[in-house]
Amino acid sequence: MSVLAVIPARYGSTRFPGKPLAMIAGQMMIERVWRIAAAVPGVDRVVVATDDQRIMDAVAAAGGEAVMTDPDCRNGTERALDAVKRLNSDADIVINVQGDAPLIPPWVIGGVAETLRADPSLQMATPAIALPPETEARMRADKANGSASGTTVVFNKAMDAMYFSKNVIPFRRKPDEGAPTYQHIGLYGYRRDTLEGLVALEPTPFELTESLEQLRALENGIPIRVVLTDYRGRSAWSVDAPEDAVRVEGIIAAEGELV
């Protein structure tokens, strides 16, 4: 059962143009993500899906593989499928790895791939981590101040997602009691045909309300298996703006390289 990891990397960004090429501790961000994905056991091929020749050239110079995709792709999911088609890939499983996540541990990617490989009945999988109480409290405070950063997920006993939200869910009637809060990690694994079917569907009401692509799957009855993981003491941080790249450099200096 072959696994293809696709890293969508768009050059244009309102807050950080050219973000994939940003240098972080001596390596371009997109190179870092590519190297992490390439280090995952069981991933057979890693490809950067881009819309810009500068990213194509940079990935090739770093020893990676990239494919040019349609500049009109509306999101990373569409770009991932476009890459699969342009590569004429026969991969059974496609892993969509965020190009702005240079601190994603390889074992998190591997856990999603292995979950799909182990159970052929699963259509999609995505990781989540349990939040410590202090992190949850900080997230709730940030949300109260209008932050849209961070997504949480609730799931059933079978570990299938019931809902994803930019709000912190579940609501706590008693602050110190009840189930943990789980933060969603924006990485997805799909069966090839599930990815094709998902992209063909129209955007759905909750997807548009929350601005969360994965809700399109849930609203159309496509189950998403939640894979619980952890960062093993390492920090998580994505890059949305130049100051985030500086923060990531500091984390790497303190914690060392992932690969």
Curated annotation (Swiss-Prot):
Keyword RNA-binding attached: no
**Ranges in a coiled coil:** none
Sorted alphabetically, which keywords does the UniProt record give?
Answer: Cytoplasm, Lipopolysaccharide biosynthesis, Nucleotidyltransferase, Transferase
The record's subcellular locations are: Cytoplasm
Pathway in which the depicted protein is active: Nucleotide-sugar biosynthesis; CMP-3-deoxy-D-manno-octulosonate biosynthesis; CMP-3-deoxy-D-manno-octulosonate from 3-deoxy-D-manno-octulosonate and CTP: step 1/1; Bacterial outer membrane biogenesis; lipopolysaccharide biosynthesis
The protein's Enzyme Commission number: 2.7.7.38
Give a single Pfam family match.
CTP_transf_3
What catalytic activity does the UniProt entry give for this protein?
Answer: 3-deoxy-alpha-D-manno-oct-2-ulosonate + CTP = CMP-3-deoxy-beta-D-manno-octulosonate + diphosphate
The biological process GO terms on file are: CMP-keto-3-deoxy-D-manno-octulosonic acid biosynthetic process; lipopolysaccharide biosynthetic process
Q: Name one GO cellular component term.
A: cytosol
* SUPFAM superfamilies reported for this sequence: Nucleotide-diphospho-sugar transferases
UniProt-recorded Gene Ontology molecular function terms? 3-deoxy-manno-octulosonate cytidylyltransferase activity
Q: Gene3D superfamilies attached here? A: Spore Coat Polysaccharide Biosynthesis Protein SpsA, Chain A (3.90.550.10)
Please, which domain of life does this record's source organism belong to? Bacteria
What job does this protein perform?
Answer: Activates KDO (a required 8-carbon sugar) for incorporation into bacterial lipopolysaccharide in Gram-negative bacteria.
The UniProt entry's sequence similarity note says: Belongs to the KdsB family.
List, alphabetically, the HAMAP family matched. KdsB (MF_00057)
UniProt xrefs under NCBIfam families: kdsB, PRK05450.1-3, PRK05450.1-5
Q: What is this protein called?
A: 3-deoxy-manno-octulosonate cytidylyltransferase
